[in-house]
């Protein structure tokens, strides 16, 4: 079972979503382009419009989603494409009666922002005991905590580490930079045993890089072949294949640059002798005779740190020399009393 918090670099999800616009041939093309990148997971949306939008109250919205539907056979074909290429397949499932035939392809379940408080849908996924990833657009912190508590009350397995993962998201296409609110991930980290991540709707990839630096375990972004001359809005916030590979390369570089939160001398510093050569020791700045009482102006702190560290500079003031010592000679505490 995948644990997103144990990965060395963030888990990346290329969200094709509805960018195929109901055209299966185009869906296959986008899927293959995503497979050819270094992304970890390729994601779609599974639904029947009548299970998602009320056709009486919102007929235009219902018709929009109907145009973007694919068939069961087509969804399975796309899932098999990913599986055969050793890429993870995933989908936001908006019609719970579609879960049974796609579950075997899913290593986790993704809840979109609009469904983060749709408890009947969420409950239908919990019987599979797979990690849950939840986008949190539109939500208050109280609503997020309530959803986490609902899941854990329904199935205690989800109290375990990284079984629930919260993605900061702003539900608009595109959003301004000041609407990304990536810092919210720090609040999510305070919820016991959850993983955190970011689902991006900005233009470009800067927000994703920042989220990686902030400790995102999961990064989700929309994916397309080309943003030019596209009417459907999601294309405008989507990354293209070369941009995906550049992003993943940059994430790995930035994670290396971030390093460890534990401060200690690194092997390269030790091996090259820099602890000695860069730090200072205490030396006499003049020749002095046995019996001389050391004054501050007799001492100087110089590189390299051979002998007595400059940390002990003050300790030598007022000491008496037990032997004659030459200027710049390496010192030892045994020379003083």
Residue ranges of predicted features:
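Catalytic cores and adjacent flexible loops of soluble metabolic enzymes
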Residues: 1-337
């Amino acid at each position: 079972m995948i644990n997103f918090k144990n990965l060395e670099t963030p888990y990346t999800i290329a969200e094709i979503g509805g960018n195929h616009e109901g055209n299966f041939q185009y869906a296959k093309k986008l899927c293959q382009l995503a497979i050819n990148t270094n992304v970890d997971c390729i994601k779609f949306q599974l639904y029947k419009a009548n299970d998602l939008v009320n056709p009486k109250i919102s007929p235009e919205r219902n018709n929009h989603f109907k145009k973007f539907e694919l068939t069961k056979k087509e969804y399975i074909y796309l899932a098999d494409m990913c599986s055969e290429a050793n890429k993870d397949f995933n989908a936001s499932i908006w019609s719970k009666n579609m879960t049974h035939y796609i579950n075997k392809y899913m290593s986790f379940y993704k809840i979109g922002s609009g469904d983060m408080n749709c408890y009947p849908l969420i409950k239908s996924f919990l019987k599979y005991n797979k990690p849950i990833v939840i986008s949190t657009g539109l939500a208050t912190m109280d609503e997020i905590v309530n959803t986490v508590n609902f899941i854990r009350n329904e199935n205690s397995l989800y109290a375990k580490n990284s079984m629930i993962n919260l993605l900061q998201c702003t539900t608009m296409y595109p959003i301004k930079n000041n609407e990304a609110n990536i810092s919210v991930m720090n609040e999510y980290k305070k919820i016991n045993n959850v993983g955190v991540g970011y689902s991006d709707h900005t233009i470009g990839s800067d927000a994703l890089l920042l989220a990686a630096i902030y400790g995102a375990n999961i990064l989700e972004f929309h994916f397309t072949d080309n943003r030019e001359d596209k009417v459907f809005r999601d294309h405008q916030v989507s990354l293209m294949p070369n941009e995906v590979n550049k992003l993943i390369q940059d994430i790995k570089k930035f994670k290396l640059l971030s390093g460890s939160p534990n401060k200690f001398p690194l092997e390269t510093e030790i091996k090259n002798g820099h602890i000695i050569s860069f730090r200072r020791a205490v030396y006499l700045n003049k020749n002095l005779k046995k019996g001389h009482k050391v004054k501050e102006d007799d001492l100087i702190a110089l590189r390299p740190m051979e002998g007595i560290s400059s940390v002990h500079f003050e300790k030598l003031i007022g000491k008496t020399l037990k032997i004659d010592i030459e200027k710049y000679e390496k010192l030892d505490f045994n020379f003083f009393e």
